Amino acid sequence: MGQKIHPVGFRLGITHEHQSRWFAVPDRYPELLQEDYKLRQYIEQKLGRLAQNNAGISEVRIERKADQIDLEVRTARPGVVVGRGGQGIESLRTGLQGLLGSNRQIRINVVEVQRVDADAYLIAEYIAQQLERRVSFRRVVRQSIQRAQRAGVQGIKIQVSGRLNGAEIARTEWTREGRVPLHTLRADIDYSYCTAKTVYGILGIKVWVFKGEIIPGQEPDPLPPASRDRERDPRDRDREPRRRQQQRRRQQFEDRSNEG
């Protein structure tokens, strides 16, 4: 059933954590759960893909401590969230307090996403933006996979569903590179889903990213830098023997010149 169940929910408590971490009495639990939904919706409207200033929001984590709410916003563009002189955070905090209608203290911690091309939600968001601009889905998927491989992921799978390229009959196409072991619980798999609204209808984008295995008691291995992941051009390997021969000939010519 690893192919059917949600990859993140399947691994909660093993390789993934809950996005909302707090406890409440049963009477207040529905109210606080709705507050979390409103907070995430507000942040998505102000800084998400459809906002005027898209900050590339990847994830919003919420913690509650008495009358205090701690928000951790993971974004690809922290400068857009913070704003000039911190005005962006202050405006966001004021809007959230007005949304909740209370004087509870809200703390916002902005965390930059180190590997944008290895984040499943940001990849799905990028594909949705390109599809809404009527770019060929095959080209967008191929570019996203290449960028993810350069970012150091061990495997990636992308699925696009709907009226692809304006076809009369909807269909589903997917592409996979590397390993994506959905049955392995210790596998660190990032999953996300996004929709693209086109003139032909809504397209669904699903992205699975396999970043490696997390063994209990060991720290997860960081993704290697992009510079190390770039493969050498095979033509350079053919050029190396030629360069060595040219250097030897030059050295022999210089030795003969010195002897003369």
From Swiss-Prot:
Alphabetically ordered keywords of this record? Ribonucleoprotein, Ribosomal protein, RNA-binding, rRNA-binding
Q: Which GO terms describe its molecular function?
A: mRNA binding; rRNA binding; structural constituent of ribosome
Pfam families the UniProt entry points to: KH_2, Ribosomal_S3_C
Gene3D superfamilies according to UniProt: 3.30.300.20, Ribosomal protein S3, C-terminal domain (3.30.1140.32)
Query: GO:BP terms for this protein?
Result: translation
Which cellular components does GO assign to this protein?
A: cytosolic small ribosomal subunit
Q: Is Ubl conjugation one of the keywords UniProt gives this record?
A: no
Q: InterPro entries, per this entry?
A: KH_dom (IPR004087), KH_dom-like_a/b (IPR015946), KH_dom_type_2 (IPR004044), KH_sf_prok-type (IPR009019), Ribosomal_S3_C_sf (IPR036419), Ribosomal_uS3_bac-typ (IPR005704), Ribosomal_uS3_C (IPR001351), Ribosomal_uS3_CS (IPR018280)
Described by its record, this protein's role is as follows: Binds the lower part of the 30S subunit head. Binds mRNA in the 70S ribosome, positioning it for translation.
Q: Which HAMAP family match?
A: Ribosomal_uS3_B
**Quaternary form?**
Part of the 30S ribosomal subunit. Forms a tight complex with proteins S10 and S14.
Q: What is this protein called?
A: Small ribosomal subunit protein uS3
